[in-house]
Amino acid sequence: MIPNDAEGAMDSLLKEIDHEMEVTIGTIDAQEDHSKQKEETEATNQQTWKLPLQDIGDETMDMLVKHNTKNNVINPNFNKKDVDTNESPKNNNDKNVVFNDNVQLLELSANMDESVLMSTPTKSDIDISPNKVLINLGDDIANESNEDNKLPLDNKTESEDSDLVSTMLLSKIPITHTENINDFYEKKSTDIRASTSRISSVSSDIEGTPLPTTVQTDQFELLKQAMKQTFEEDNNSNIDISPLKESLLSSELKTKQNLSIEQNEETSVDSIDNSVIHNSEYEVHARSNEREEENENDFENSIEDLEISTHVIEKSPSIEAISTLDPNTDNNKEHFIINNITKDSTFIEVTSDSKIQIDLKDSPENTLHTNEDQKEANTENVASETNIKETDQVIHIPTLTEEEISTITNITNDTETTEEGSKAEEDAKNSDVSNSQNSESINTTITNSLIGIDQNLTNKSSDITNDYEEPPKENELKSSPDVIEKGHSSIEHFDDEKITNSSALGTSNYISIPLDTLQEATPVTDSGKTFELQNQDSDNINSERIQNLNGSTPVEEKFNADDELLKTNQSHITQNKDKSNINEIDNSGTTSIVSDHVVAPILPPLPKIDKIFIDDPFGEEYDISNDSIDLTKSTRPGDYLSIWHIQEEELKQVSPASTTNSQFSNRILSNASSNASAESRISSTAFKFKPRIVSRSRYINPESRVNSFNISEEMILPQLYGALDPMRRSSRMSRTIQNSIKANRQKSEQYAGTRKYSIEIQPNQESRISSRIISNKLEEVSSENDKVETMNNSITMDGSFQLLPSFLDNSFGEQLDLTFSKFAKDVLSLRSSSLAQSEIHDNSINIWGEDNFIGNTSKNNDHNAMLDSKNKLLEVTDDEKSISESINKDIFADGILKSSIFNDITVSRGLNINGLDVDLSDSESVRVSLLTAETDASESGTPIKNTVKDSHVSSPFKVVNISKWKNQDGPESDHEVEEIAEIQIEAEKSSESIADISPIKMKPFVDTVVIEEPSQTALVDAGSLYLKLKGCLNIKLTGIKHHDARYCFEFDNGRNSIQTAWAVIPSDGDIRVNHDFESTVFEVGSKLYVTLKCKYTPPKTEIVEVVEKVLIPKKKLFGKAEYKYEKRFVQRDSKKDEWNNLFARDGSFGRAEVLLDHTFLNSVKYNKRNCTFDMMNEWTRLNDKENIENVFNIPRKPKYKVADLKMEVCYLDRVSNKEVFPVSFDKCEMIIKKYKEQLLISKEGYLMQEGGDVCNNLVRRFFKLQGTDLIGYHEVSNLPVVTINMLKVIDVVSSDDLKEEEGKQRSGNSKRNFTDHVLFGGCIQLVFTDEEVINLYADTSAQEKIEWYSKLKKTVDLNICHQPWVTKLAEAQKLEEC
């Protein structure tokens, strides 16, 4: 039932609350028929509610005070003097109103019976929309405001009280759920129709009621700014409005209410969306406290502020901004709570069933979109500006003279053949027209064009290198006639695409100009020269070397800038020719004029490699330490480019790559003849390949010191085996004949002209390009281009040829030269057939000959002084003859060059042939060659630099002669011998080592730094082994009782030993003991020895069994005498004791050995196990009757078993260095017992907690103590909230402990510390390792507190039992029990 007015609704609400607290839930008025059945079922759940006054919430008290004040003001019979006397005393204890943090301000207690809510009327009986309620309440307020003049109070009080009534009804009545409010109305109202007529009459009267309408303009601006700031901070923040002193127009209020009624009719009650804008919890409580103080002190100010704030909320156009927030926040409740920032602000709640529409021009969303659009626009502007900066580059071009402009004009006129030429022509013409305005652009165009050509040539060179990484096949070397005819035409012009690509590699200002145009326009210089380009802005300038097709060496140009001409922006050229050295361009900043005769490189130039190794790292001139490395296994150039360059340089003829049939032929860029004479093509480029240093070893090219193709080398006829055979060089006659032949050959001019031919060899296809293998002596080879080098061939002969004295004349030399000339032609014509010899080395071709053999010391035979030294070196002693006879005729360790063109070529030196890889055949012996080299060097009177030094690879090992090694004295000799022996063993096992090398010793040559990785903290030991000695059974000893024997056991783990006390050995020989021992296991795999020791007293006398002959008495006088034999024991002095040979000098009789390996330790890990070990005697000696005095010198018996050792073993491994192991296993079991006892500690009950997860407050929780876990449960839900680990608690303190401590510390006239008694009285403190403290209060009884303290204290005291080994051992024992 709805009450007659709003005042009746508040009275009914308060009365209903009082009625619910005082009377049981089951005794409710049975006026409603539909609630009678539920009242009967719930009649048993009767409960009386009584609540102290201090437990009523602050907001509830605020609401009650305001309501009573309003009633007292309106009531004409109210007397202010009787306020205190008329107050009902039961209101202090009977009100139980519970508030939570939600927007729903009023709700009943959770434990109240639900029958109160069951009396709600249906929707068909009454309109329960919130708009209706608000309108009705507003009508009541207006109606009452018209009747205020009838009250006996003054006008000022009437207006203020009227405002209080309207403000209270609109702001503090809990109408968040209109159905519940209508239920409250219905409980006290009995006439629905009367209430309806009352509301309609009030609504009709309120239309004519005028309201103050004066509102200042600056107040709206202030409200607007406050709304902006609130929405910008958070969508869920509060809307703070400053207080206004003027109310808004009443007509606008009526219009708003009518609009709300129309919207409510269209919208159903179920679809109400509730959204809340409220302050944080802290702010709400703060404001409520402020509100309480204000209401108690000054009610008039609050009434005025509430009235003004209410009108501002209803009339402000900015309040529509609330609809822009999320309508689903806070449980979809559409309550807007608007709080003022000022001191006089109050808590206001506005409710409606529809969303309030607000038009915010400066809303935060619009602002955000506007800011984002501006940012995007700014970003686009910045990007566009950046592009403009990138594209609009300022180009500074120097001016040109008239001659240069005319030259450039001629260049541009002839560029119509290609696309790039046409572009350059247009640029040149345009620049000619605008020359007066900006003549600098022409110079930059030409400069960039020349640089583009330079890059194009560089790319061409790189293309040539990339195209010819694969080895050329024989059929590829021959091209069709069409290609040959098109040679010049196809070579004269660059490919258009490649010109464009090469120019694109530079800056954007580069323009590609055809080379033909430059050739016609630029001045003509010497043909076949190298042109080099230079950019003004470049610091590092790369030079390109261009070679002629016929292999001629280009003359390089060097351009130096004149400083005076730089000021006038004119370029001059200074040419410096140098045939021997390779020069680079200086950074002068000027451009050069290109020669008209530009030639593409036949072969891409080789990179210049500077010296990166020390010539003689060990400082000894005649060091030949080559035993540690196989010289023939050294790395050699295996790429085609290096091979062709070396072949062309040494053979002095056109490379197979530069023939007309080669693919390199189409790279020529000039119309000049390609048949010009070639000088040298070995040069270097500005770009240097940086080699990777593998070690400190140094590679030296042997060809730089020994001319491989010298006319003075030995030439031997094929199929001849005689005096000139290397095996017969020991005779002086052969050497004389040989020298005569050499002298005759030097006079022959025809021989020199027939030596100029080339041998083409296809290298191993598996070889890779390696720049670091290229010789450092290429400059020396290129500088000797004027010399005519000839090939020196030596061909092995068979034994059919016999050298005669008549061959010493000149005719023999001419005939020999003719023979070799014919043979050389046959070699050229028959590459694969004539050079393809059988694998028999007698018929193999020796390219270098004997003089280049690794063991020979002769370097050049052109001088007579060298011939004398050679004669001395060729003298062979008897020892050398025996060596040569034991070795076959392949003594020179000829290397076999493997190629796909021919089978084998025997090589004496065995390093490389023009960069080709050479492998040693299986039949050669490197050891013999090394021995020969040492013998020759040792016999020479004057030391001559050996060719081995020129060709070998330096080694970090120093060779020491055996004599010096043996003669070394000092304490370090033996140690060095051991090290050398170990090195020799490792060298023999290695596959790359040389057999039977001399003893060597190491010299440090690389400073190695060993970086140790951080490892985990090492454990001090592996754990403890607990031994419980049960006894020693079946001891094999006799006469124990007579020797008064005693025993003891000794335990030795390798570091420490322990011994038991001496005890008497039982006579039966079984020792039964029960001793505990603890042995630390320092390392897994160690051994533990248990020794049985005995000591005894040797007996002084001994009892011996004696057989005596006893005479039997005669029966007759003259009868025969008879005897009998009797055995008896006779005591005598002992001469020998059997125990003397059974024991060691220290009394050891038996020893048991326990191997502490992983298998044994794992079997007894956390498991007590009985084990039996054999006691072995290894000290017993053989019986020797002759040597009784020297017992210990008698030979020993093999060890044998003398007893059985019984022990109980358990192993506990270590996990942490902080673990502490007891000294015996009995203590371990005691600790396990305490550990189990701690786990059984339990206690539960209610405690008040302070600290931990509870800050500045006391929380009552239900605690359970189980072992080391103290778990706190929620008082209502019984869910676990907090778990306290008692293992981290180091102390438990109570108030009694504080008293005891104070009594000990207090002395004399010292005062008591009452602060601790007040703060900690009745509490239990838990002190943690991090000094955190949690206080627990037992609010039940003192005995409960004592029990909690004792349980917690015992738990903390037993924390010492918690170690890793304790937990594992307890679990293992639990498994055994199961």
From Swiss-Prot:
CDD domains: PH_Bud4. Residues 71-95, 361-441, 458-480 are annotated as: Disordered. Keywords: Cell cycle, Cell division. Residues 361-378, 420-430, 470-480 have a biased composition (Basic and acidic residues). Gene3D superfamilies: Pleckstrin-homology domain (PH domain)/Phosphotyrosine-binding domain (PTB). It is found in: Bud neck. One of its GO terms (biological process) is axial cellular bud site selection. Residues 431-441 have a biased composition (Polar residues). It comes from Vanderwaltozyma polyspora (strain ATCC 22028 / DSM 70294 / BCRC 21397 / CBS 2163 / NBRC 10782 / NRRL Y-8283 / UCD 57-17) (Kluyveromyces polysporus). This is Bud site selection protein 4. Required for selection of future bud sites. Cooperates with other bud site selection proteins to recognize a spatial landmark during mitosis and they subsequently become a landmark for downstream polarity establishment factors that coordinate budding and cytokinesis. Involved in the septin organization at the bud neck. Belongs to the BUD4 family. Residues 406-415 have a biased composition (Low complexity). Its main location: other. InterPro entries: Bud4 (IPR052007), PH-like_dom_sf (IPR011993), PH_domain (IPR001849). One of its GO terms (molecular function) is GTP binding. Disulfide bonds: none annotated.
